[in-house]
Amino acid sequence: MKLKRLMAALTFVAAGVGAASAVAAIDPALPEYQKASGVSGNLSSVGSDTLANLMTMWAEEYKRLYPNVNIQIQAAGSSTAPPALTEGTANLGPMSRKMKDVELQAFEQKYGYKPTAVPVAVDALAIFVHKDNPIKGLTMQQVDAIFSATRLCGSKQDVKTWGDLGLTGDWAKKPVQLFGRNSVSGTYGYFKEEALCKGDFRPNVNEQPGSASVVQSVSQSLNGIGYSGIGYKTASVKTVALAKKEGAAFVEDNEQNALNGTYPLSRFLYVYVNKAPNKPLDPLEAQFLKLVLSKTGQQVVVKDGYIPLPAKVAEKAIKELGL
């Protein structure tokens, strides 16, 4: 289910959050984390680069509470999570996209049931440009025409210069330099599906190994444009407001707009786990996820620049996990 439909169903309102809010608000109805006893052992996480900082920060908090826990984190990209979970080489599979059917089938073929997707944060996938770029906003059709070779979203012409996007003066003839993620990345897959209408990327997109690399590359290129999770924003870049179609209002990538579904590139971030039906999770995994879905865990989400879960989403996940 897409984020906007779920949020509409929950009728969640981000109380007290203005349109220009830079700091996400914690839902006061989120549960407090209660420390358990006897939690120790080894926990491994393999998956998303987008979630790398979050997983590390959650791991640090978890180890503070449980010093006898050792946590290993590998963050090469979302596509590394499904095989690691299926092969049993990881307990946790952080992903910035949902698993594909073929990934679910491989897991189900081995275990007889599907892995459980746990929503852990909300992300606004942002379009970044250099801080000195005067562009005010882009339509989703323009975004497709910038990054795609196929233009399946409906744009009638390619975008090769900033003049093609309406900039004038010295900017008009400047070529657009593209930065993005590689195909192992869940962000790559999500952007391909949602922003390119399942089309193909241009061959001249400079593929970067991580989200931070995309933002850093854009910050060093006056002509640059790239896509990455909002949590990687720095002072050297700015994000571009997006409109769903020509003539529609440009929408900023803030908490309120991500949660109410008006921002076009809102998504859940997930941690997948191997939970057998009618069997409790191992205490190591259970307490980690319980921490992540608590006020304490969601404060970490805010600290890392992402958007915390509404309490109703966290409650649903807690119930499904039997925590």
From Swiss-Prot:
The protein's matches in InterPro entries, at most eight in alphabetical order, are given as: PBP_domain (IPR024370), Phos-bd (IPR011862), Phosphate_ABC_transporter (IPR050811)
Q: What induces it?
A: By phosphate starvation (at protein level). Different strains have widely differing amounts of protein that can be sheared from the cell surface, in order of decreasing quantities MDR25 >> MDR1 > PAO1 > MDR13.
Classify the source by domain of life.
Answer: Bacteria
Q: Which GO terms describe its molecular function?
A: phosphate ion binding
Tell me, what controls this protein's activity?
Arsenate, pyrophosphate and polyphosphates up to 15 residues long inhibit phosphate binding, while organic phosphates do not.
In biotechnology, how is it employed? Can be used to remove inorganic phosphate from water, which could be used to control growth of microorganisms.
Q: What happens when the gene is disrupted?
A: Decreased phosphate transport. In PAO1, decreased ability to adhere to and disrupt a layer of human epithelial cells. Hyper-swarming in the presence and absence of phosphate; hyper-swarming is usually seen during phosphate-depleted growth. Increased induction of alkaline phosphatase in the presence and absence of phosphate. Double phoB-pstS deletions act like phoB deletions.
Compartments it resides in: Periplasm; Secreted
Record-level GO BP terms: cell adhesion; phosphate ion transport; single-species biofilm formation
Q: Where is the signal peptide?
A: 1-24
Q: Which UniProt keywords apply?
A: Cell adhesion, Periplasm, Phosphate transport, Secreted, Signal, Transport, Virulence
Q: Which Pfam families match?
A: PBP_like_2 (PF12849)
Q: What is its main location?
A: periplasm
One GO term describing the cellular component: extracellular region
Task: Report the SS bond pairs.
Answer: none
Which SUPFAM superfamilies does the protein's record reference? Periplasmic binding protein-like II
Please verify whether the record's keywords include Secreted. Answer: yes
Its function, per the record, reads:
Binds 1 inorganic phosphate per subunit with a KD of 0.34 uM. Required for phosphate transport. In strain PAO1 implicated in host cell adhesion; in some virulent strains (e.g. MDR25 which expresses very high levels of this protein) antibody fragments against this protein decrease host cell adhesion and increase transepithelial resistance of human epithelial cell monolayers. Its ability to bind phosphate may allow it to acquire phosphate from its host.
Protein family? Belongs to the PstS family.
Its recorded name reads: Phosphate-binding protein PstS
What organism is listed for this UniProt entry? Pseudomonas aeruginosa (strain ATCC 15692 / DSM 22644 / CIP 104116 / JCM 14847 / LMG 12228 / 1C / PRS 101 / PAO1)
